[in-house]
Amino acid sequence: MNEKVKRILTGVKKYLIESFGDKIRQVILYGSYARGDYNRDSDIDILIVVSDDANPIEVEEFLSDLLFEILLNENELCSVRAIPEKLFKKYNSPFLLNVKEEGVMV
């Protein structure tokens, strides 16, 4: 993972924690940047695990302005999904298995 992506991820996590506090349980990078096989067209895939009393859709929508700024200022597209902690721990869909196996904690 390159330094620009590390800086972006650190900023996203800080922004989330400042806004949602302990409702943010984990921020995980997954996909090509986590695997190290990214190219210039790759997006930055981020999974946010939230407490069960948080609204994942609200977290995703909250980030939309920041993600747009990242696109404009850094020329990096970020794709964000949020999921309640209970579902993240309980289910092993192909997507979640991939994140659990290849994901990198931020």
Language model: regions and residue ranges:
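Basic/aromatic recognition patch in beta-strand/loop cores that engages polyanionic ligands
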Residues: 32
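Catalytic core of pol beta-like nucleotidyltransferases
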Residues: 1-25, 35-36, 40, 51-106
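Short beta-strand->loop micro-motif that forms the acidic, two-metal-ion catalytic signature
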Residues: 45-49
